[in-house]
């Protein structure tokens, strides 16, 4: 692995890196709307649920879930992303918990509180050395019969190559 790859992996663990992405609008993964597969999933949910969205970014998915009556906690550590989520939540008069923090520092008061964790772009952005820690945290947040629902896209790379 070359030093550039290592530098990039170290950068993704920094809120400064992500805040710069949102401030400079270099968020190529951002669809600019709710993720279609999560919209369809949410529209089919019968029971109002408690949903956790890690690395929520601009918040299209958690805001949509809230609009549909679910209790939502959206977490991101990029200041600009959190500002955008709060602005849009206030504009739409939505009840949603938005927390600016490193998800690895999430308080234990949230443990075993969620029916669902929605994973889309957070796991792939985590330094591979911390992915087991991420899995453990998501397990801690889910209720005993809770489910992690995610989109995982194969990159045809090994973990050592950033996959």
What are these regions (language model features)?
Residues 2-52, 57-110, 126-163:
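Class I (Rossmann-like) S-adenosyl-L-methionine-dependent methyltransferase catalytic domain
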Residues 118:
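A conserved beta-strand element that flanks and buttresses the S-adenosyl-L-methionine
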Residues 121, 125:
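Short catalytic micro-motifs in class I SAM-dependent methyltransferases
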């Amino acid at each position: 692995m070359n030093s550039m790859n290592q530098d990039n992996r170290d950068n993704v663990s920094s809120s400064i890196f992500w805040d710069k992405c949102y401030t400079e609008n270099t968020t190529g993964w951002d669809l600019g709307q709710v993720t279609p597969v999560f919209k369809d999933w949410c529209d089919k949910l019968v029971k109002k649920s408690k949903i956790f969205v890690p690395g929520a970014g601009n918040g299209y998915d958690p805001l949509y879930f809230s609009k549909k009556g679910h209790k939502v906690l959206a977490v991101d550590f990029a200041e600009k992303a959190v500002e955008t989520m709060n602005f849009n939540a206030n504009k739409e008069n939505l009840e949603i918990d938005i927390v600016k923090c490193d998800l690895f520092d999430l308080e234990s008061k949230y443990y075993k509180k969620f029916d669902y964790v929605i994973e889309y772009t957070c796991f792939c952005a985590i330094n591979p050395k911390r992915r087991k820690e991420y899995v453990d945290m998501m397990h801690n947040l889910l209720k005993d019969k809770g489910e992690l629902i995610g989109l995982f896209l194969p990159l045809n790379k090994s973990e050592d190559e950033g996959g």
